[in-house]
């Protein structure tokens, strides 16, 4: 559906991207065989199906390690305690939609098989890759893209580097760059001779530590309610994980997007498509309005669904 001459929104039916191998849930038998430590966290839900406690960060971490190893051949993935633990199905969804934006089919025409990095024509920048490095890892493992992950936290980059050390093919195609300026996005990361086909970003969406804690407790409460249990404030307030730069920044998601969009204009000739996740629906239109004001030649708004949760990707470019 076209909203204007240079922008369009793609409405998606409920569910993950058609390329997403996680559309049919998790094969816990295969996952625990691949990563035995997962066994201790598997239990039955009220209807007798295998699941884990998604409010337990250790359980989610073990599930992620198993998923990445089993489906994507990414070995020994881990994150430090307290780091953001990403939901793999949602993260690979973003990559699939970006691949579609770029016109990239899955290598060999197969759905979500682990591939050697042979599609080096595409280069992706992950702004704020975090300690999990998930977008660069998945983009390289599935599509064979060359990737650069940037972050303001040297410890986060050190963790991604340790993961890459156990994955030689990924290590050869993913590089990491420290952003020395916490208020910059592309400056000092994109070098004079760089060209990226696309940039991706998952902004911190809270404006303060207090807001981040309240958001996490809301998630815990909702999970507890779905299990017919009471959530108490005595439970870890950041059980879902996430360090300062990963969860919140001054001004929250809206100001983060505003700054990134403004800075993107200076790198219009070095990035084919700028993209970002937008978690809060009320932040979408202000971002798109600013993008158009800055003279973007094409603007996209992509809606993604993971269960009952709707997220959005905005994409823009300044050249045909």
From Swiss-Prot:
Keywords: Cytoplasm, Methyltransferase, rRNA processing, S-adenosyl-L-methionine, Transferase. Its main location: cytoplasm. Residues 1-20 are annotated as: Disordered. One of its GO terms (biological process) is rRNA base methylation. Its EC number is 2.1.1.181. It is found in: Cytoplasm. GO terms for cellular component: cytoplasm. InterPro entries: METTL16/RlmF, rRNA_lsu_MeTfrase_F, SAM-dependent_MTases_sf. It holds the Pfam family Methyltransf_10. The keyword S-adenosyl-L-methionine applies. Belongs to the methyltransferase superfamily. METTL16/RlmF family. This is Ribosomal RNA large subunit methyltransferase F. It comes from Saccharophagus degradans (strain 2-40 / ATCC 43961 / DSM 17024). The lineage of its organism: Bacteria, Pseudomonadati, Pseudomonadota, Gammaproteobacteria, Cellvibrionales. The gene is rlmF.
